[in-house]
Structure formats: structure tokens, C-alpha cells
Amino acid sequence: MKIKILSAMVASSLLIGCVIPTVKASQSAIKSIETNRTITKVRTGMLSGGSSIITTSYEGTVAAYKFNGEKLWENELSGFMNHDIWVQDINGDGLVEIFAANADGNVYCINSDGSLKWTFGLNEVPMNSVTVISDADKKYVVAGGYDKNLYYISTNGELLKTIESGTYSEEGVFGDGVKPEARTHTVNFVRPVKSSDGTEKLVVLGTNNSLQSSGRFYIFEPFADLPSEKSRISIKKGIGDLRTVDFDNDGNDELTLGNSAQIGDAAISVMNLDDLSQKKSQINDIARRIDRFGYRVAQTEVVMNEGTPTYLTLFGSRILLTPESFDVNDSEILANKYSYYDMWKDKSSNKLVLASAQSGGSQVHIIDTSNPSWKSAYEELEPQGKLAAIQENTRAIERQLSNFQKPTRERAPLPVYFISESRNEIPTTIERSEFLYDSPVFLNYSTLPNVENWDRSEVLADNPKYRDKRDRRKNYTLSSEEMFNKLSAGYDNSDGISQWAGHGNDPYMISLATMKRIISSGDGKKTVNIYPEIEGHGDAFNKVLSDHFYPLAEFSSENNANLFMRNKHTFWQSTIYAPEWSELRSGRLADAFVPAMEETTDKSMEMSVAGRMGLWAAGSVDNWGERYARDNPSFDRLRQHSHQMVPNHALRQIIYKIASGARYINNFGFNQEYMSLAWELIGKGALYVPKREELLSLSPVHISMKEPDPIYRETSNNVKWTTFYDEEKDSIPYVFSRLNGTWPGAKTLPWDYSNYAADTKERRLDFIPKFPKGLVLITPVQQGKFKDEGTVRGTLADNMHPIYKDIMKEYITDGKNYYNPNGEQVMAADSVRYRQIKNKIEEKSNLLPMTVSGEAAWVVAQSAEKHLRLTLVDSGYLNPSNKVAKVKFNSVTPVAIVDVLSGETFSPDSNGVVEIPVLAGAFRFIDVKITEDLRNMQSSTL
């Protein structure tokens, strides 16, 4: 924990190499303060320097700034995210203390000078909300989170009272599958509400599901054990914002709340606490007047608009100014280019403070709503700092790429299939790419609101569960002939087609017979059938595999078609190792199945890439895929700030995965002009797409999965409920742990694979993982009792680069424990075994040509006889920053090290280490010339 105090204004000289003015001209309606960090929450309060802005950053650093831009101090706290901060004076000195509800399970109290006052915490379950409530002359700190308790804490940090939600909650459970206990909840928000007589009450917003329930209000008298009132919430979906306002200035607070949702469900509400009445307004009513897609949190304050009190709602990149009617149809709408993480009203000045832009911004913005030009100033606001830098860094790469020529020594680029790009947004760019390059390949993608209505009674006579399943999003109206005509037409004047062909809700949207006919009509052109969220258990699902998926895969393998299995959660490192999926693992259908992911709500991205690549390296499949959607950042569905308008995070995600060998890309078509840089990098050969036998950044140590432990399999795929925490059960160590809905942003445990193998420290968004000692694959078992019988995939080393032939080391797990090959010895996840694995990863990393540390993601592949291609990527998914990649050469001697785009050269020091800068939001492609062809070297000489 570090604190830095600054006594004078800090010049904003960013690591990105440019100097940004700290504050805009004083006469402007908007002033911007550079922080050099991605600011996710803002508050205001009185510090020794006067009224000040309090910020918390993506990584949990709390800092204070004067309104003139002077930085007062910062405190790094735990290094984990703060789910909530609250600012209030608790000791009567006129200066505020700052309270942070941290994902490490603690509440931190920070003094007004930035020093730590106290820490409160009973476990490592994330704290989610914190506030202060007054009762006459007493003040209490109140906090709660995912352990389902509400805590009263003294102003000195001592526990005064614990209130278990099970003593008063009315939250119900619903749906199929394993469900948590009913009548319990997690604390989504806790806030004080003031009355005109000076008294306060405590409002707790409790919920048990991050996606499908808005929860309830529970209203307490200060320090009471039970609520005096309860109320349902009038809007649907998880609530992402709750705050108090006083619209009519009568001294009695009202509550404004907004949900965390996509546009179809987006809504705001205001609650009168006198009678618990609520007014609501559906933002979807004005969807045509705002940008429709994206996942946003609606945040509502009250401002004076031309002398009239008005509700101001920040909704992504839009501000809605709504009159007293609270009807958004009457709103004035202000549009900016970017979306912002948070908004706070400073009551002493009536100014609004915006947190950083979600696309990688680093500034906070102060809006003076008393300035007549503030509306136009907001619409014209162009954040500087990191956001400007990452866009300039992208443009610099584009300029360098225009002069790049692929070395003649390298083979032709492998085809990379973009299976869902929109030809409507930038058709000429796609046409140009198709004219100039053989790769990437763009398929004709069809969305299917209407699907086949076929007679399932005979084919599925013995499977009534799936015979009767339907997806509510689809209209079952087409005949087989109509379905055929609609899709087969896509082959005309194209390289192939792609479409949703089914879903976990209904795998049979298109009958097997019709789909075979469609594929045949393509005459060998590529067909990709997308199957999202395929997950099932028991005899009924086994029949789906044997009657539909495996026969379709056999037919596909003979007709240049693929099944793009877009599964969720931990499927590729848990469910895939269940007995019913043995045929996919066997390798007999390797050219048909493409493992892919839909990783919204997930917090285990570093594992999923290791799982997909493990099946690929093992020979179970010949290809693997990746997907980007607007809600990829939605690891916490209760706070879906997933409206990034510059998809730099997505660009880096896709580049890292393609550099790792992914060749089937399922992107949501958004800002394709920006994303098209990836197409050009592939087409010109700057982004090297490796075969699996060319990769050299894989650790020789791999974790092999036997049939998954049933509790691990179930809990790691059950992520929407927030109330599964059980102290006794959660104390049991697992190799893959803290994966259900209880743990957003939580720290990973030392014995967890994510921690010791991937260097992933939190359950959040590691889409671009570091793996500093080499990517540790999660694979099928290679030897011993748990090895699959009757496979044709060969051994792992058979499919990998020749250097791996005699250096591989396998450790076997079921997700909970470790096992020796004969199954006679079982070792707990937190036993000495994990330390042995960690040490072995370190030891074996010296056998790799190189390893990379320093917060940059990396991939190495052999690109030619005596050349290696090193791809370096800024790993900060939503908080990009300058990185320094420390490249350590181990088993090779570099002759020359050159950036293939910029031409910059590098030389290692006497320890064989070279430091290569990676700019914020950027990536580099480095050619390393070596003395020998690694394919001819014996592993014993490495």
C-alpha cells in the first residue's frame, strides 16, 4: 500500500510521450484534469485545499485533486478495484474521510491527507457498497457486499453489528438448474436518505442475481436490526446506479436509480420515500434518438437547466435532460462521441464531474452547468490524455503498415475467417481487402429472426425435452425450402456463408436434413454454423450430441464446413472433459469443430484461451476461434459500463488471439473502420498467423483435465446468481476457483491456476493474458489411467514445434485436486503440488527461446528458417498504458532484433535481456533473427 502526496500542481507528462494541459482555459464550460489513470468513479468533498475531487482508478488507486487540477495525493490501497467509494466527514473537523468498498473484501478508510486511517474486513469476499449514516450525534459506517451481510462499523473501524440478509430478505429464486438459497441477498447499494427534520434512514438495495433481477429496497432506521419498510423496484434488470436527490428542494431526499442493461431494457426511476411511490421511464422509448446498441448504466442527478430543476441522466455517450414529468419522451438529448464511467454532482458548486471515457480515457471532466455554453461544450468534448494517445498510436501503426512489405522468406498468410462482419458499414474497405489479399476471408453472415418450423415428432420422439424446446427470440415460420433458399443464396459471389444454426436454448433451429442440403449447395465453399451457449447434461443432451452435432460434424468435415461452438464460462476447461464430449476430444472430427467463447459475465478469460489452445495443440481440433461483442467488458452485470466507442480493447484482443493461432473470428460489427486495421495487418502479413507447430511461447508444462469434479463444473458455469457464498464450502481449495457470481474483481488465490500460471491477480477481464513463463495449456490427459481411449489425435508433442518433443511435463487435475497418472494419489489444490508446478513452470521456461515479463502480452512463433516473430500487445484491456516488455533470451542467440513496421532495432544487454517499449493501446511485431533453425535442433541442446 503506497501513498503519494503532491504539494504543487503536477505536470501531466504522460508515459505515452506527449504533454497534455492539466486544465482547459478557465473560461470554458468544461475543464479537464489529466490523471494518467483510467478513472472509474468520482466523488467530491472538502479537503485541506478546499473543495476537491476524489477519484478511484481501474486498479483501485484513490486520489484527490483540487478543482484547478492540482493533485493533492494518491493512495494505491490494495491494488484491487473499488466497487464503491463514499466521501463524508466523520470526525467533525470539516474535512472528509474517504471510504472504499474493495474487491479484496475490505473497507478502507482514508484520512483527508490521503493516509490510511483504518481497514475493516472479515473475509476476502468483495465488498460492494459503503456509506455513512447519522443518528443524532452518532455516525456509523455501513457496508455490505457478496458475503450477504450488512456491517455497521464504528468511525474507528471496529465492527459494531452484523445483520445477515437472511433475517429480512424477500428475494426469490427461479429457473432451472442449481439455485442458491431463497430469501437472502447481496448488498448492491447502501445509501442514507435525509428528511427535512434532519433525520436519516438507511436504504439497502438487495439483489441475488446480477442479470435477471432488480432486487428490492429495504429501509432501516439507523442501527436497527430489521427494516421498517420494504419495496419492490419498478424497473427490470440489475440496478447499476442509486443516488439521492432533492428535486423540489424541500429537504426530503428522493432516490433516483438506473439499471445496467442494453437499450431494450434500459430504464430510470425516481422514488418518493414518503409513500414509496415510483415514477419510471423506459429509455428504449427514445431508442431511435440515441445510439441503440451497447450496455450502459443510467445515472440520474438533478441540475438547474435554464433556471428550472431538471433530471439529468448520463446514459453512455448521451445526456438526457428530462423535465419534472420524468418522461424521457420529453427529454432534450445531448450527444458526445464517448461514454463515461461515472458522474457526480458537487453540491457546493452544482458542477458535474465526469469520470474517464470508457475507451481508455485518463481525464476527469468538470462541467459548469451554470455556463450557458455547457451543452455545446459537452457535445464537442474531445478527451485528451490516454484516449487521444491510443488513437494516435493506432494511426502511427497504420502509417507504418502502409510501407510494410512481407519478407519473401515467410510463407503466405493462413486464411483467417471473419464470420460476422457487416458489409453495410464499410463495404468498400471489405471489397478492397478481398481484392488485394487472400486472407482475411469475409463470409456472408445472416442473422435469422425466422428459422425452420419442421416436424420434430419422429426424429426426436425419444427426446421430448429437446423436441419441445424453442428459442423465444426466434420465429419458427419457415419451411425447409424457405430456409434453404434464404441461406443458400449467400454463397453467390462470396467465399462462403455463416449463420446461427442453433443455440443452447434450441440446437434444432435448422433441421439436420436442411442443413446438409444447404452445405452441399455451396459446392465446397466455406460454411460456418454458429452454435452459442451449448451446454447440457444427462441422457437428453447426450442424444442431441449423437443425433445432431456429431452427424453434422461428420458431414461438415467432408464439405469444408465448421461448427463454431461459441460456449460460455469454463466449458473448454470443464464440461468438454465430460464423457459425452469424448468424440470431439478424440480428434476424429478435428476439422469440423471450432472451439470458441462467449465470455460476457465471465471472469476467467486467461483459462479459456488456455483451454481452447490446449485442445488445438492436442489435435482434438484443427482450429479455434474468438469472439468480440460490445458486452465483453460486462464481467459485473450490475455495473455494465460496456459502451466503449473506440474499440481499441477489442482490436488488441483480436490481434493477440490471431497471433496465438485463432483463425475464426466472430466480431460484433461496430466501428469497423477502426477494427479494419486488423484486416490490413493480416492481409499484408505483418500480423503473423501461426500454425500450431510453429508456436514457441507455450510452456512445456501443461495441466491436463480428467473428468471434471462435479462441484467445480457446476459452480464455475453458474455465474449470474450472486448469493452462493458459503464460508465452509468456499474454504475448500480448488485448482480453478472463485468463478461463480460471488467474486467480481476478487483476488485470485496463490494456488489457483490463474495466479501461478497466468500471473492473473484478479477475477476480472484478462482477455490479453501475460503468461510470463509461457502459456500453460489446459489439455486432454496424455498418459496414464485418465487418458481417453480410442483417440486418433496423437500425442501433444506430435502436434507442437519439434523443440517440445522431449521436454513436456504433465500435471493432471479435475479442477479441484491434482492426481498422479495412475489415480492412486490425490493432492489438494493448495498442497505442495501447486508449488511444484509453479517451480517447474519457472524451470522449464528456460528451455523456451525467449520469455517476456513487464505487463505486456506476448506470442512467439517460428516464421522462417532462422527467424522468430515476437508479437507484443499492451495487456491493459480497459486501462491501456505504456508497457515495457522485458524480453529474456534463453535457448537462442539473437543476431538481429527489428520491429517489422517501424524498423527500430534492439540489442540485448549482457544478461540476454532487451527492453522493448509498447505504447498505450498498441502492439508491436518484432522479427528476431537467430543463428540456427530451431526445427533442426535437438531439445537436449536447447
Curated annotation (Swiss-Prot):
Superkingdom as given in the UniProt entry: Bacteria
GO biological process: cell wall organization; polysaccharide catabolic process
Enzyme class: hydrolase
The enzyme's E.C. designation: 3.2.1.162
TM annotation in the entry: none
GO CC terms: extracellular region
Broad class of where this protein is predominantly found: secreted
InterPro entries: Quinoprotein_ADH-like_sf, WD40/YVTN_repeat-like_dom_sf
Alphabetized UniProt keyword annotations: Carbohydrate metabolism, Cell wall biogenesis/degradation, Glycosidase, Hydrolase, Polysaccharide degradation, Secreted, Signal
Localisation: Secreted
One Gene Ontology molecular-function label: lambda-carrageenase activity
Catalytic reaction list: Endohydrolysis of (1->4)-beta-linkages in the backbone of lambda-carrageenan, resulting in the tetrasaccharide alpha-D-Galp2,6S2-(1->3)-beta-D-Galp2S-(1->4)-alpha-D-Galp2,6S2-(1->3)-D-Galp2S
Stretch forming the signal peptide: 1-25
Biological role: Hydrolyzes lambda-carrageenan with inversion of anomeric configuration. Does not hydrolyze iota- and kappa-carrageenans, agarose or porphyran.
Assembly description: Monomer.
Name the record gives this protein: Lambda-carrageenase
Organism for this UniProt entry: Pseudoalteromonas carrageenovora
Source lineage: Bacteria, Pseudomonadati, Pseudomonadota, Gammaproteobacteria, Alteromonadales
